[in-house]
Amino acid sequence: LSQNISSLISKNLFERILVHRNDRACGAKGFYTYEAFITATKTFAAFGTTGDTNTRNKEIAAFLAQTSHETTGGWATAPDGPYSWGYCYNREQGSPGDYCASSQQWPCAPGKKYFGRGPIQISYNYNYGAAGSAIGVNLLNNPDLVANDAVVSFKTALWFWMTAQQPKPSAHDVITGRWSPSVADSAPGRVPGFGVITNIINGGMECNSGSNALMDNRIGFYRRYCQILGVDPGNNLDCANQRPFG
């Protein structure tokens, strides 16, 4: 199945999409490799292998776009445009806090911080715990692995992408057309498309408030990547009029 992924996204395409990630200005330069991405996808066999070629390409574009927004080093007048600077960082910038929430199932380890790391910027002990359990790595005790081991890093992002967290569907099911909105979803405007994936990831901050720069940045990456991969981005790209999930 991993062969299917590499037949859709070659190393050459990967380099074109994430063209500036190894720029000297990028904190994660040298970290995110094509080989680590392909290796990580083997753990999540349905990723990029579900549906027809068009659907599969759209999923790859959507995943790389959402994660590029989370890790971008781009700015408005950046060389090759702001959407050529995804995967510039692998840890939250600034002085992030502990991101420790009370949890019986996934208690924080002493002295460990669970700030954003990796392509999806996984945050909080309960996400590190659940992701680590799913991929067979103790991330509660070793959260820095997500910024030190590129395969583990990609796996945490793929885990988030492939896993539904109630009441939200998985991003995978949305982009592959497997999610049908319930009445409770349709009334608040949550319809299939790239926009509802933004809602899944960060709806409370970015959705149901008209146009905003964060939401538009995600769409910008997605349009560029769809163009490179030769697919139509589809409808419902924004979440401007979608209420966040409960």
From Swiss-Prot:
Q: What reaction gets catalysed by this protein?
A: Random endo-hydrolysis of N-acetyl-beta-D-glucosaminide (1->4)-beta-linkages in chitin and chitodextrins
- Role, per record: Defense against chitin-containing fungal pathogens.
Under CDD domains, the record lists: chitinase_GH19 (cd00325)
For this entry, the protein name equals: Basic endochitinase
Q: Name one GO cellular component term.
A: extracellular region
Q: What is its EC number?
A: 3.2.1.14
Give the intrachain disulfide bonds.
C26-C88, C100-C108, C207-C239
**What causes induction of this gene?**
By fungal infection.
Coiled-coil annotated residue ranges, if any: none
- Quote the catalytic residue positions: E70 (proton donor)
Which compartments is it annotated to reside in? Answer: Secreted, Extracellular space
The UniProt entry, under PANTHER family, shows: CHITINASE 10, CHITINASE-RELATED
Similarity section: Belongs to the glycosyl hydrolase 19 family. Chitinase class I subfamily.
Biological process terms from the Gene Ontology for this record are:
cell wall macromolecule catabolic process; chitin catabolic process; defense response; polysaccharide catabolic process
Membrane-crossing segments per the record:
none
One Gene Ontology MF term: chitinase activity
At the top level of its lineage, which domain of life is listed? Eukaryota
Q: Tell me which UniProt keywords the record has, alphabetically.
A: Carbohydrate metabolism, Chitin degradation, Disulfide bond, Glycosidase, Hydrolase, Plant defense, Polysaccharide degradation, Secreted
Tell me if Hydrolase is a UniProt keyword of this record: yes
